[in-house]
Amino acid sequence: MLRVASVGSGSKGNATLVASEETTLLIDCGFPAREMLSRLDQINVDIADIDAILVTHEHSDHIGGVAAVSRAAGAPIYATHGTLTSGKLEGARTIVEIESDSEFAIGDIEVSAITVPHDAREPVQYVFKHAARRIGVLTDLGMVSPHVQRAYEGCDLLLLEFNHDLAMLRRGPYPAALKRRVSGDFGHLNNDQALGMLEAMGESVPGTVIAGHISEQNTSVDAVSTLLGPLIQRAEMNVIYATQSQGFDWISSDASGAVSKVA
């Protein structure tokens, strides 16, 4: 069984966990160590259970707590060369440099590091495989390139960024430069882009989609839910919404795509 959980998803901090029966992986940690311990407790995870930490990129909402949590967990950090050159992992326990678009294994979980367009030094996102089950984690990208589209085909569960409603962003309070950054090709996916990615998958659309990195200023769970409504009915797809405050509890899915909450 392969399962996934999050202790928070959004611009104030991100941390996602993917686990098999034998291996527990943490993807990013944008929370201070003490806060992270409290958040892990909410999903019944002991920090010592974390076998490795995979970093997507060097922005503080993803990397801010990684070095401290690595030391506390005694877990190695996996990151690209570009991410390592940011200097934000100083004091980390053990670092393993990975290549973009590479495949490797940690314990009994196979990992693919996928290059994505984002305004960071060498950003990647990840696909995880175990016992014929695939979980994709895909946030912090400004567009869905053909390469990204192909890499995430055939996932059973997909954590996908629905960052902003473009109209809400344009009329919102952000400075003009930040609006251009967020909406640009190296920024964040807007809701329509994320929906378009799912629709392009056709019959291979994941049975379960987790909408994540939802901006608290520029969209809402209700807006994303309304947008996804027709696809949910047509594809009989399960949708879960990751929040900034709590993320989402452990879930897995069976071959039919049915969602199960797991401890």
Predicted regions and their residues:
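Short, basic/aromatic-enriched C-terminal tail that caps enzymatic domains
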Residues: 235-263
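Active-site metal-binding motif and surrounding structural segment of the metallo-beta-lactamase
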Residues: 34-79
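Metallo-beta-lactamase
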Residues: 79-133
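Cap/insert and terminal regions of metallo-dependent hydrolase folds
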Residues: 146-243
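Active-site neighborhood of phospho(di)ester-bond hydrolases with catalytic His/Asp-centered motifs
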Residues: 27-30, 50-58, 78-81, 136-140, ...
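Conserved beta-strand hairpin/beta-sheet module of binuclear metal-dependent hydrolase folds
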Residues: 1-43, 124-140, 157
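Structured catalytic core of nucleotide-sugar glycosyltransferases
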Residues: 5-15, 58-66, 71, 84-86, ...
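Active-site environment of divalent metal-dependent phosphoester hydrolases
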Residues: 59-63, 84-86, 120-121, 143-146, ...
